[in-house]
């Protein structure tokens, strides 16, 4: 899996992730592998190969780091998913 990170401060970054089954796993992996710290916000475009349909799949995940807590955020939801160690 690949993740393209669009940070709120304007920086962009590409990282390779181990396979993640949920948005929560993506958020945690991006925060750990993408070197995000307290106060960072980002939109993450996750790309993976779908072998059954022989095409790439994309999904967007919004991540915010509050202190050392990782949150999935949207216009209506702010969900705690883990902590940065």
Residue ranges of each PLM-predicted region?
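Short aromatic-glycine-(Arg/Gly/Cys) micro-motifs in beta-strand/loop hairpins
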Residues: 1-12
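A short, charged, amphipathic alpha-helix used as a generic interaction element across diverse proteins
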Residues: 21-39
